[in-house]
Amino acid sequence: MTQKLHIKTWGCQMNEYDSSKMADLLNSTHGLELTEIPEEADVLLLNTCSIREKAQEKVFHQLGRWKELKKHKPGLVIGVGGCVASQEGEHIRTRAPYVDIIFGPQTLHRLPEMINQIRGGKSSVVDVSFPEIEKFDRLPEPRAEGPTAFVSIMEGCNKYCSFCVVPYTRGEEVSRPVDDVLFEIAQLAEQGVREVNLLGQNVNAYRGATHDDGICTFAELLRLVAAIDGIDRLRFTTSHPIEFTDDIIDVYRDTPELVSFLHLPVQSGSDRVLSMMKRNHTALEYKSIIRKLRAVRPEIQISSDFIVGFPGETAEDFEQTMNLIAQVNFDMSFSFIYSARPGTPAADMPDDVTEEEKKQRLYVLQQRINNQAAQFSRAMLGTEQRVLVEGPSKKDLMELTGRTETNRIVNFVGTPDMIGKFVDIKITDVFTNSLRGEVVRTEEQMGLRVVQSPQMVINRTRKEDELGVGRYHA
C-alpha cells in the first residue's frame, strides 16, 4: 500500500520551493505520495516561517493538532522544518516531545536519512546546521507543474537588517554554481515551463561559481537564463536596493524576457527609520534606482515591502513614507505592522508606537497603494497584454485564465491548446481582482526569440551523480 506525505507550508516563496523539493525527494527515495488530508499521511511535515509575530505559538498550535493523529497512528512520523525549526532547534521537542524530526532550511536534503533513522528506532533527529549549498547537490531532478516554475539560485542574507531573522535562520549568502542553475532551468524548459522566477533572500547578490573558476554575476545569469529557448518570461524575488547595480538595470534595456515588473523592498520612506533598520540606503538612493529603471523601461511597474510602526517611527516619518509611495507610484505592496522578532537588534528597541496608531498607518498606506493599483488596472482597458495561459478559469470552466507581466489575472474565451502558451489579449473589462479580454494573437503569430534550446544546455552539461548535479564540459 502506497504511503502518504502531507506538507503544511507557511511563509515565503522560498518555503514553497523547499516544500516542493521535499515532496519530490521523498517520492523518489521512499515512494511517498502527497496528500492534502493529514489523517491519511504516514509522514507529516510542517515547513515554518518566523517572519511574523507569534510564529512559534502558531507552530505549537498546529503540532497540538497533529499530536492527536499520532495517538491513533503510533508509526506516524512528524517533522518540523523551516525558519522556526532553525531558530528553536531542540527546544521544539521540549514543548512537543512527540515531534520526531527537526530540520533547518539547509538540511532538508537529509530528510530521507532522518526518516530512516526514526523508523529504525531512533527517538528523535535534530539537524539545523548550515552546510552551505549542499542541499541542492542532493535533490532529484525538477518536475514541472504547469507553465511557471520557481528556481532557487542562492540562500541566506548578509545584510542583517535590525528587524530581520533571516541571517540567523537561513544563514549567510551562498550562491549555487551557475551551471547547476542553468541545468535545472533547461530541464524545466524541456518539460514545458515558459516562465521562471529566480528565488533568493537577496537574489541580486548572486555570485555563482563558473566552470572555469570564475564568478557569474546576477546580471550575467539573467541573460543566460533568458537565452534558453522556451523561457520567454523571467522574474526574480526578492532583491535589495544596495545590490541593485547598473549592470542589472542594463539587462532591462536589452532583454525582453525580463518582465516589466519589479518587487524591490524599501520598508520605509524615512531616512531616519531606514538608518535604524540598518538598510544602508536612503530614500533618495531608492528613488534613483527607480528613475534609472524607468529610463530604460518606461512601462515598468514596481511593488515593495513596507513596515509601519517601527520603534521610534513618528508621524513625520510615516508621512515621508507616504510621500515616497506617491512619488514612486507603487503598483502593489506587502505591508505589515512591525512586530519584534526574538534575537534581532530591533527587539531591544522600545516599541513606542501604539497599536492603534500602527493599525491606522497600515490602513492609510494600504488604501493609497490599492488606489494606485486600481489606476494601473483601469489604464489597461483597451490595451493589448501578453498573457501566459495557466489553465481553466476558476470563475468559469468554459474560459481560460492567465497572468500578465504585472501578475494580473486575465480571464478570456480560448481553446485548450492555448494552455501553457502565450496569447495577446485585448483588455475589455476591468474588475477589482481580475481583468477580462479577447484573444487578438496566438503564440505562433508572435515570433518569440530563440537563442539556444534547452537540450543544447543539457547536452553541454554532464551529470556528476545520479541526482542531477551538472557542470559544463570544457
Curated annotation (Swiss-Prot):
This protein's source sits in the domain of life called Bacteria
What are the TM regions of this chain, as residue ranges? none
Question: Which reaction(s) does its UniProt entry say it catalyses?
Answer: N(6)-dimethylallyladenosine(37) in tRNA + (sulfur carrier)-SH + AH2 + 2 S-adenosyl-L-methionine = 2-methylsulfanyl-N(6)-dimethylallyladenosine(37) in tRNA + (sulfur carrier)-H + 5'-deoxyadenosine + L-methionine + A + S-adenosyl-L-homocysteine + 2 H(+)
User: Where does the record place the Radical SAM core domain?
Assistant: 143-375
The molecular function terms in GO held by this entry are: 4 iron, 4 sulfur cluster binding; metal ion binding; N6-isopentenyladenosine methylthiotransferase activity
Which annotated residues bind [4Fe-4S] cluster 2? 157, 161, 164
State where the protein is found.
Answer: Cytoplasm
Q: Which UniProt keywords apply?
A: 4Fe-4S, Cytoplasm, Iron, Iron-sulfur, Metal-binding, S-adenosyl-L-methionine, Transferase, tRNA processing
Which ranges carry the MTTase N-terminal domain? 3-120
User: TRAM domain spans which residues?
Assistant: 378-441
Cofactor(s) the protein needs: [4Fe-4S] cluster
Alphabetized PROSITE patterns for the sequence: MTTASE_N, MTTASE_RADICAL, RADICAL_SAM, TRAM
Question: Which Gene Ontology CC terms are recorded?
Answer: cytosol
Coiled-coil spans in chain = none
Q: Which residues bind [4Fe-4S] cluster 1?
A: 12, 49, 83
Provide the primary localization. cytoplasm
Cofactor binding description: Binds 2 [4Fe-4S] clusters. One cluster is coordinated with 3 cysteines and an exchangeable S-adenosyl-L-methionine.
Q: Give the EC number.
A: 2.8.4.3
Does the record carry Metal-binding as a key word? yes
Family membership, please give it. Answer: Belongs to the methylthiotransferase family. MiaB subfamily.
**What HAMAP family has UniProt attached to this entry?**
tRNA_metthiotr_MiaB
Assembly behavior: Monomer.
Q: What does this protein do?
A: Catalyzes the methylthiolation of N6-(dimethylallyl)adenosine (i(6)A), leading to the formation of 2-methylthio-N6-(dimethylallyl)adenosine (ms(2)i(6)A) at position 37 in tRNAs that read codons beginning with uridine.
The name of this protein is tRNA-2-methylthio-N(6)-dimethylallyladenosine synthase
